Amino acid sequence: IDWSALGFDYHKTDVNVRYYFTDGKWSDMEVTSDEYIKMHMSASCLHYGIELFEGLKAFRGVDGKVRLFRVEDNARRLRSSAERLCLPLPTVEMVVNACVEVVRRNEAYIPPYGTGASLYLRPVMFGTTAGLGVKPAKDALLIVYCSPVGAYFKQGIKPILVAIDREQDRAAPRGTGDVKVGGNYAASLL
């Protein structure tokens, strides 16, 4: 891999990990090399946006050790997003274990220290219940996959000064502005 030429895009790695929620309980972790999923054409995620995702990175340090950046924080936010979308709640431990396992099994894709590249992890969860009408999904799939990536902005970014107001919130109460769901991003294409 030419680490210096990587952009922010998907590159196949060896495995991804999955948990299935059916019949009121989570499955054991499944490790697979399959990049595809099979689901019903009326799955709730396809029609009603019952989908969420996270994004975090693994880095190799100057000492050669691999470090995950804020994995527990991402796991808690994933749970918060799942709760908001009425999806089954994975434990923080499940999400952390999935992230650790996908990094461990794809260690060859972690860029060397100093390249500016990283291993990007994408936990994604969605309702898989077949049906019509907006209602909570009874079934779900949680996947964690990864990809080596370069900088999101290849040309870099210019820092700016901002004021942060922790007393005000622009997100609508009980809306989706403070959770990480795909629908929040679709409008950016307009």
Q: Whereabouts are the PLM-identified features?
A:
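Charged mid-protein connector segments
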Residues: 112-113, 137
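Helix-start/capping segments and mature chain N-termini
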Residues: 1-105, 131-190
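Non-catalytic nucleic-acid-binding/docking modules located in mid-to-C-terminal regions
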Residues: 108
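Extended, Lys/Arg-enriched charged tracts that mediate electrostatic binding to polyanionic substrates
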Residues: 114-126
